[in-house]
Amino acid sequence: MYAVRFATAASYPTRFLVAGADSARRSQLAFTVWVMEAQGRTVLMDAGFYRQKFIDRWNPVGFSKPSDAVTALGFKPEDVTDIVISHIHWDHLDGADLFPRARIWLQRDEYEHYTNDSGAVLDRAIDLDDAKMLAGLRRAGRVRLIPGDSSEIIPGITVFTGGKHTFASEFATVRANLAGGRQGTIVLSSDNAYLYENLEQHRPITQSLDTLSNLRAQARMMRLASDPRLIVPGHDVAVFERFPKPGNGVAHIE
């Protein structure tokens, strides 16, 4: 299982990531997609972004399209068979149409809440064009709606709700081969835990619809992972320091 960074935000207020953080603190943000192979399928967790309006708004450092970034692992965009969307914020959904053969998996409640106009306008991080794109992919038969918590969608990949970053955001567990040839469970938190600081200090994310539910989801991640170090936060540049190989924006989570 690999984390692939396709862009970095050089300075972002930490108080928007970690509840109660000092207002003077700033953090770098890694924009990442996660790549894994399961049962002959090539699966992404989240799809990143690429449209020019987001690049202009955020001015990210070292940007490359997610479809280009995954070529570092030898994959072409058309090799990707499945994309698990943790939630439909712009920086996780926008790149879904870069992968022409991929099935898109997300929670039914998330889809139905945010692809109607009344739900989308309640969250500034929902891009209406992305929501329309997702609805178009569903009409094309490429979207699979997940019925709820604890759903194994692909052998070895199970999704869980409760983090409440959005209406029905999800995180995933992945059964993977780890260092030394052993098998274990990796947890991909996505934005249900932005940084290691959320997890290691048990601090809720700031942008949550339900702080208590977010803390419970973090505790659940701790129970599900084979080891706490195998819980991977959604935007922490330290992922690429704790898992430094093979390098150049790619981290092998093992």
Task: Locate predicted features.
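Active-site metal-binding motif and surrounding structural segment of the metallo-beta-lactamase
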Residues: 60-106
